[in-house]
């Protein structure tokens, strides 16, 4: 019998640093509950998450609220609490959708971890002073524990898989079992709305998001193009950042999820810059909302998007200008074709099936096609 304890008790949509990880955690819980060969599924949830879960009857929800009440509660959960609950549930597997094992205790059951990226390792090399030393040390030890103590690791992309394997080799750890499960999206029920003469720029205070570079590129594009609309800047930036002012720049800060979707839908193009990602969700969401994305041509984003969207080189202002001009002239029919292609490639049903199939293999059980 295949049984899984699934931990989402340490997540809170109001405080999460990654809405993508939160969406994966809730969506995957739902589609795992729909997998016929997963016979037992216990969801360790909390009062902020349970209302976002749509589960089949086989799933049993147990609320554990202390991990979201304080930092110490979260640390206790990470290092001891989740293992205590996994032992009590007596399922053979514990699934960690945030991807971090305890580095203090050994798991009482087999662990399957979903690792989204190794951003902390990237920052330790590229921006070593950005993350506080204690926090950086904590997550570095958690990543090592995940590589060493997981029976299997799932990732969102081939790029993330290669990063994990490289990390294991470079640190002298035993090569882990890493399976690309992928990431999923659902069709947008509403038809694309009427476009306004606006461009949406995702901004972020994290240095790997290259906000200053994107603003610089857009400033030149505004100067050289005949675009007379508005640049909506979605997200938070460092207080020390010198933001452009004037009627064409609209700095919004952080907004609710529903409002961000509307901002994407009304824009003629979405700009997403980055130098490191494990997958890259916003460009896909832009296409699904009927808007052309302009995005950095880094490995993970190119893998995720395939032949869709308008990529540009972070090292080339001219490639950005060309990508913007292509995006604003993109035909709605092309965007519809891209949307259908991306939905075929990235489905939650396929993600959960890959995960369950691998757990069945690990258990020596037969996979039913």
Q: Where do the PLM segments sit?
A:
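Carbohydrate transferase catalytic cores enriched for Leloir-type hexosyltransferases
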Residues: 1-369
């Amino acid at each position: 019998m295949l049984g899984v304890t699934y931990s989402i008790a340490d997540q809170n949509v109001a405080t999460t640093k990654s809405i993508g990880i939160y969406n994966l955690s809730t969506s995957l819980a739902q589609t795992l509950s729909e997998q016929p060969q997963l016979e037992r599924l216990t969801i360790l949830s909390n009062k902020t998450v349970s209302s976002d879960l749509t589960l089949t009857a086989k799933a049993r929800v147990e609320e554990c609220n202390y991990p979201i009440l304080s930092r110490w509660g979260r640390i206790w959960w990470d290092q001891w609490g989740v293992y205590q609950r996994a032992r009590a549930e007596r399922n053979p597997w514990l699934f960690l959708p945030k991807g971090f094992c305890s580095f203090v205790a050994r798991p009482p059951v087999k662990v399957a971890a979903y690792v989204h990226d190794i951003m902390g390792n990237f920052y330790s090399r590229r921006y070593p002073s950005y993350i506080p030393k204690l926090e950086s040390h904590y997550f570095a030890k958690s990543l090592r524990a995940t590589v060493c103590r997981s029976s299997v690791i799932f990732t969102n992309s081939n790029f993330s898989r290669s990063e994990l394997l490289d990390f294991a080799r470079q640190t002298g750890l035993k090569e882990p079992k890493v399976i690309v499960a992928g990431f999923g999206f659902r069709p947008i029920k509403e038809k694309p709305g009427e476009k306004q003469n606006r461009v949406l720029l995702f901004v972020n205070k994290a240095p790997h998001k290259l906000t200053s570079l994107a603003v610089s590129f857009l400033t030149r594009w505004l100067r050289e193009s005949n675009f007379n609309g508005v640049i909506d800047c979605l997200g938070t930036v460092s207080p020390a950042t010198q933001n452009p002012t004037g009627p064409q720049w609209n700095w919004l800060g952080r907004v609710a999820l529903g409002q961000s979707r509307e901002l994407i839908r009304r824009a003629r193009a979405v700009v997403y810059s980055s130098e490191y990602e494990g997958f890259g969700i916003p460009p896909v969401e832009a296409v699904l909302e009927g808007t052309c994305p302009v995005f950095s041509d880094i490995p993970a984003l190119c893998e995720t998007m395939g032949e869709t969207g308008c990529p540009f080189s972070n090292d080339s202002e001219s490639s950005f200008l060309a990508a913007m001009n292509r995006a604003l002239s993109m035909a709605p029919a092309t965007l519809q074709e891209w949307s259908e292609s991306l939905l075929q490639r990235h489905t939650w049903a396929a993600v959960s099936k890959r995960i369950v199939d691998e757990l069945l293999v690990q258990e020596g059980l037969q996979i039913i096609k």
